[in-house]
Amino acid sequence: GWFSEQIIIAGDSAGGGLAMALCHYLKDHGKQLPCGIVAMSPWTDLAASGESYETNFERDPLFGKTRDSLIYNKDYIGDNDPYNAYISPLYGDFRGFPPMLIQVGSYEMLLSDSVDVAAKAREQGVKVRISIYEGMFHIFQMAAKMLPESKRAWVEIGKFIDVLLND
């Protein structure tokens, strides 16, 4: 088996939000948390309250001008409360969370999700590294070897994991 000190949860977009939501759930139910979280362009605020939903509306090539079909998709939350921490991790209590690496592009509609969750977690005592990659779009890391920023992001993730697992 594996011990929590050997587990890092990672995800991109909704998966990044789910990684945080899972940690809220584990904490709320008295379970061991992983030793770290890697969240790439995480979707943490399904209430879409952040400033970047407006300021980056036309800048993000993945989401630009598609609010109704992608961001405000009721199929994801149904009739549930978008302020529930298991749906929108931003609204949860981060005290006791493991260290987090959050990566986001400056052109993302979800930029505020990352900035706001990093600030809240940091205020609640969590070690958070947020890296905002200038001019990058939602889940730019998927470009792997095609963009220098993507390469840099994966190197950063590798170093973060090395530190967590070798401390």
Residues of each region from the PLM?
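Alpha/beta-hydrolase superfamily serine-hydrolase fold, recognizing
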Residues: 1-167
